[in-house]
């Protein structure tokens, strides 16, 4: 039986492959940090130019969605033969998981510090665990899971306090810190909604449409807001292409992992993203990678993941059917 990614379903439900594939997804998403910074530098996009950032993100996700849909079509998947209700569901998923989430995130990031933005964005894992607790009987919140999330979140804080507490204060504004938290919640809720849709729609097709629809909305919204990107070069196009590919691969694998595993066991790996982002950014910027903060954060995040993923599985009920 195939999972919708071309890989056997059993691959995604085995613990060792869950760890490997979820870590790969987070490594790819973490690599987007230096790639985005590099793209902004090559295209002259200012940190405060939210409209241009939305245009850049729109192209990234639109291309990622197109790549997935072409691949799905070539491998014989049902790309167009969907019921009207499924089109509506995919539209809602694309608007929420890609478009709405990124609008909140980019606007929020423009109105707060990078340190606070990264830390608050990590609250998405808590939202996912809490939502799963109320939606799935086999994914209840436990002391071990809560401890694992707390340890992982502490690791995210450690990797972000590179300059001491600079950029970290008690200030809170709706357009800044508030929007970052809203973005994290929207992404968590949309991911769980996507988990439900993936039971009836091929994960590759689902991811392709949600990225494509969301990317188109971001692109049009950015252009309507005055976003203007000029001076495309071979380097900036290569970076855009890389980000489109990483998005296509990571989001498809993530959707398949969520389909075949409990939410908490997958989303706890999200704590790795800012750690990988910091490590890869330091590597490409020529900074010291083997800082104690980076190593301590990696150990803490891995410890949190271990606590959650090694939690005793609830026994499956024996089917009464013959």
Predicted regions: what they are:
Residues 39, 56, 108, 113, ...:
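Hydrophobic/aromatic residues within transmembrane alpha-helices
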Residues 68, 130-131, 143-163, 271, ...:
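Hydrophobic transmembrane alpha-helices of multi-pass small-molecule transport proteins
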Residues 59, 98, 102-103, 116-123, ...:
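Helix-helix packing/entry segments at the starts of transmembrane helices
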Residues 32, 73-121, 158, 243-261:
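Specific transmembrane alpha-helical segments of multi-pass solute transporters/efflux pumps
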Residues 2-58, 95, 169-196, 220, ...:
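Glycine-/small-residue-enriched transmembrane alpha-helix faces in small-molecule transporters
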Residues 42-100, 127-131, 151, 186-190, ...:
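Transmembrane alpha-helices of multi-pass small-molecule transport proteins
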Residues 35-48, 110, 160-173, 222-239, ...:
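Membrane-interface helix termini and inter-helical loops of multi-pass transporters
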Residues 52-64, 109-125, 173-185, 233-247, ...:
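Structural signature of hydrophobic alpha-helical transmembrane segments
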């Amino acid at each position: 039986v195939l999972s919708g990614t071309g890989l056997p379903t059993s691959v995604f439900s085995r613990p060792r492959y869950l760890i490997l594939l979820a870590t790969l997804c987070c490594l790819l998403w973490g690599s987007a940090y230096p790639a985005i910074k590099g793209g902004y530098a090559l295209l002259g996009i200012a940190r405060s130019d939210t409209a241009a950032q939305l245009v850049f993100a729109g192209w990234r996700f639109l291309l990622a969605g197109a790549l997935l849909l072409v691949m799905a079509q070539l491998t014989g998947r049902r790309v167009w033969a969907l019921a009207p209700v499924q089109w509506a569901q995919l539209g809602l998923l694309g608007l929420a998981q890609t478009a709405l989430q990124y609008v909140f995130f980019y606007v929020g990031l423009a109105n707060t510090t990078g340190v606070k933005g990264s830390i608050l964005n990590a609250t998405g894992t808590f939202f996912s665990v809490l939502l799963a607790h109320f939606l799935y009987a086999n994914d209840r919140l436990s002391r071990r899971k809560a401890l694992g999330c707390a340890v992982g979140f502490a690791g995210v804080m450690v990797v972000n306090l590179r300059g001491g507490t600079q950029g970290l204060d008690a200030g809170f504004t709706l357009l800044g810190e508030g929007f970052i938290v809203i973005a994290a919640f929207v992404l968590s809720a949309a991911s769980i909604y996507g988990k439900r849709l993936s039971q009836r729609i091929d994960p590759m097709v689902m991811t392709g449409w949600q990225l494509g629809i969301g990317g188109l909305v971001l692109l049009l919204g950015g252009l309507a807001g005055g976003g203007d990107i000029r001076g495309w070069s071979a380097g900036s196009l290569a970076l855009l292409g890389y980000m489109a590919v990483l998005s296509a691969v990571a989001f498809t694998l993530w959707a398949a992992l969520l389909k075949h595993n409990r939410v908490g066991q997958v989303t706890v790996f999200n704590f790795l993203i800012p750690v990988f982002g910091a490590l890869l950014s330091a590597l490409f910027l020529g900074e010291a990678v083997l800082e104690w903060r980076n190593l301590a954060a990696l150990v803490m995040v891995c410890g949190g993941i271990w606590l959650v993923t090694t939690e005793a599985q609830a026994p499956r009920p024996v089917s009464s059917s013959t």
